[in-house]
UniProtKB/Swiss-Prot annotation:
Residues 1-38 form a transit peptide. PPR repeats lie at residues 245-279, 280-315, 318-352. This is Mitochondrial 15S rRNA processing factor CCM1. It comes from Meyerozyma guilliermondii (strain ATCC 6260 / CBS 566 / DSM 6381 / JCM 1539 / NBRC 10279 / NRRL Y-324) (Yeast). GO terms for cellular component: mitochondrion. Involved in mitochondrial-nuclear incompatibility, a major determinant in reproductive isolation between species, through hybrid incompatibility of Ccm1 and its interacting partner 15S rRNA between yeast species.
Length: 644
């Protein structure tokens, strides 16, 4: 083993520590073992660097060409300037006097304004057929404006004057097309009744408008799905052989996808094939999105994407399909394939979006050798001058949390709180940052964000602009320091955050945030600290546990805790109240509890956890769960059990 001294970190003789520059020498320990390398990732990084150099050269050539064109245009402008001056002198001799010209202009303007003022009384904000607007009258202009739209009262006015009677079907459709989709669901029944009263059948095109307006939410409940199916049945009853229009089939596929009913999606695809309809690109995109986000079936998602690529030119994947399949590969821990698809997009000149950059950054952060690359994708969003969304900022927070950069995590959440944008996800990522703090590592590393010049500026600016003084009673309870440099500070602030969520923002609490909160106690606190969090934040859901077994009320706080490092836990006084929210424990909760028991070498507590987990496995909660991740967790639990 060789010990090497160095003083080159970030700046010649300084390192970043706790938000301040301090003079230090750095000792690097170089081991004899060679580091594992990933050739495919190294080749990708090299090819990506070459690609960027080519793009820079192309950009230089483009700017040079623009400069030459500008020079030529300026020369032409100068040569034409004298010709225009000659023409102007000739025109001036035939122009009327300034007084006459002013009088004519004022007269014309006055006539035009009078005409527009009269005409504007009959021109609504939304362009609807004259046959409909004549019945509604001038009230339509005031009922539907840029600031507000009251379509229910519009229908009231229309019904008072005869409704849809004697109005052509084409005009009725044009009128309904002008109603924004979010306003349609509450008035569908009235529109159908007005058709019935006028003796006009509801056309399939209008039924499609009704169905489309019901698909705006991310998921579709069974009650809405039944309503959509009834609309489709009405179309089948009036069509030849009971077939539906292509647009209706595609809407049904999207609806069943949002209803997580893949069986019916396949049924509709089969029916389309039977009637000779080839699925369109939009249909494939909807099926792909369902496979990625609803059923989480990666294998099917890959099959759908490959079908789109090779079926025909009309179905070739665009940005949406690439985005969804990249997310699927990232979710399945295959960042290498996701990066290949990104290169494919660049080579084929497929538009790249902010969401794709975020997904790639999320995937790269899971590989130590790609952590710097993760931040490159984030800063590419700023290079493209895209306005970062809340989701993007949340994943910037996620990268900082995975890096163990607690100072940056706190600053980002503080900024989100200033605009009341703290969500369940960002709250969980803040807790993740606490649990990943570099204080837990024996040799703290420099955050990968500092490998970028943009990263250095970004981190410095956001830390300098952060103030942790509370501005109101609902402010997040940060400690008034730039960074947390001791385990006690991390325990104290995380406890304060949990108390804040309990008292002010209970919507921030779920099983993921609770498990991360427990993990902080397991890593940085004593077993007493962990037990305090374990009992106050979680509970066993006993629903469905067999009644034949006698279960005693256990009090895990009374377990003999073999901990000689601390006699008191670090907790917020607000958590001393008895009405704190508790979430049902899951497999991950018991895994963390066993780790805490293993760390403290407490056999009694580990037995208690293992026994309770047996009850949990017999509860309704676990029986009704559809997740297929339990095998790996069981293996981890058995491995930990053997260590105790």
């Amino acid at each position: 083993m060789v010990i090497v001294a160095s003083s080159n970190m970030l700046r010649p003789d300084r390192i970043w520590l706790c938000g301040k520059y301090q003079t230090a020498r750095t000792l690097y320990v170089v081991g004899n073992k060679s580091k594992r390398r990933n050739p495919s990732l190294e080749d990708w990084a090299r090819s990506d660097s070459d690609r960027k150099m080519k793009l820079q050269q192309q950009e230089y050539n483009r700017k040079l060409k623009e400069l030459k064109n500008l020079t030529a245009n300026v020369s032409k402008m100068i040569s034409k300037k004298s010709e225009k001056e000659v023409e102007r002198s000739q025109i001036q001799s035939t122009e009327p006097s300034p007084e006459t010209s002013t009088q004519l202009t004022q007269k014309n303007d006055s006539q035009r304004l009078d005409f527009l003022a009269k005409k504007s009384l009959f021109i609504p904000v939304v362009d609807i057929p004259a046959s409909v607007s004549d019945r509604i009258g001038l009230a339509f202009k005031y009922l539907v404006s840029k600031s507000s739209q009251n379509w229910s009262m519009v229908l009231d006015q229309l019904e008072k004057n005869g409704g849809f009677k004697d109005i052509p079907s084409k005009d009725i459709r044009k009128f309904v097309y002008q109603i924004p989709k979010p306003h349609i669901p509450p008035i569908i029944s009235r529109l159908k009744k007005m058709h019935h009263d006028a003796g006009v059948p509801v056309s399939p095109k209008l039924v499609n408008v009704f169905i489309d307006s019901l698909l705006l939410s991310p998921s579709i409940p069974s009650s809405v799905m039944s309503q959509i199916e009834s609309y489709c049945d009405s179309i089948r009853s009036t069509s030849k052989k009971g077939r539906l229009p292509r647009e209706t089939y595609e809407l049904l596929i999207r609806a069943y996808g949002k209803n997580s009913n893949l069986e019916m999606v396949n049924s509709i695809l089969t029916e389309m094939k039977q009637v000779g309809l080839q699925p369109s690109k939009n249909t494939f995109e909807n099926i792909l999105a369902t496979s990625v986000y609803k059923s989480k079936d990666h294998k099917q998602a890959v099959e759908v994407f490959d079908t789109m690529k090779f079926l025909s030119d009309k179905t070739k994947p665009a940005e949406r399909a690439y985005r969804d399949i990249i997310v699927s590969y990232v979710n399945n821990d295959d960042i290498e394939k996701a990066l290949d698809l990104y290169n494919e997009m660049v080579e084929n000149k497929v538009e790249v979006s902010q969401q794709i950059m975020v997904a790639l950054a999320r995937g790269c952060i899971s590989r130590p050798e790609l952590k710097v690359k993760a931040w490159e994708f984030i800063f590419e969003i700023y290079n493209q001058k895209w306005e970062p969304t809340i989701q993007t900022l949340e994943y910037v927070l996620y990268l900082a949390a995975k890096d163990g950069d607690v100072a940056l995590c706190r600053a980002l959440v503080n900024k989100l709180s200033e605009t009341s944008s703290v969500t369940v996800r960002s709250f969980s990522f803040l807790l993740l940052g606490y649990s990943k703090s570099s204080l837990y590592n024996e040799s703290p590393s420099i955050p990968p964000i500092l490998a970028h010049e943009n990263g250095i500026r970004f981190r410095r600016n956001i830390l300098a602009d952060s103030s942790y003084a509370p501005s109101s009673e609902s402010s997040l309870p940060f400690l008034p320091v730039l960074d947390l440099v001791t385990e006690k500070e991390i325990l104290a602030e995380s406890s304060a955050m949990w108390a804040y969520a309990n008292t002010i923002r209970p919507d921030l609490i779920n099983i993921e945030s609770a498990n991360t909160y427990l993990n902080i106690g397991a890593k940085f606190g004593s077993l007493k600290e962990f037990l305090d969090r374990y009992n106050s934040a979680t509970l066993l859901d006993r629903q469905g546990v067999p009644d034949t077994r006698v279960i005693e009320d256990e009090n895990l706080a009374e377990v003999s805790v073999m901990d000689y490092t601390s006699t008191a836990s670090v907790r917020s006084p607000l958590l001393d109240r008895n009405h704190t929210l508790k979430v049902p424990r899951d497999d991950m909760t018991y895994l963390i509890a066993l780790k805490a028991a293993s760390k403290a070498r407490n056999y009694e507590f580990s037995q208690e956890v293992w026994s309770e987990r047996g009850l949990y496995r017999k509860s309704d909660r676990i029986r009704l769960s559809q997740e297929q991740k339990r095998t790996n967790l069981i293996f981890n639990l058995q491995s930990l059990w053997s260590q105790l």
